[in-house]
């Protein structure tokens, strides 16, 4: 007897996982992202693909759009809402290719994009993952 494959997680199911992840973030982090909107879509839109020079829409798992906290100013308010996009199909492909837990993949992508909200570069975040600490910060 063969198993009937279950359908891939829906946009709403990924949103629920992302919302659960947000609830588990430390208060110090969560406090600064209350106004950030989380959106789930199947793929980045074609303009994003072109602007980022993607070879494939599967090359991008998530994206932060907005003005990072290190560049915000009360003298120059931005009218746009800060948003984090999670792209369902690329995330699901990555999940299938790696065999990692889906919630772990979503958490990793979400925290990576939150890092951009804080003004961290990809290089900063790679360093943090490798070293386990934020450059320039020490614990007393």
Language model segments and positions:
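Active-site rim/adjacent substrate-binding subdomains
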Residues: 1-105, 117, 121-126, 132-140
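Catalytic glutamate of the conserved HExxH
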Residues: 109, 113-117
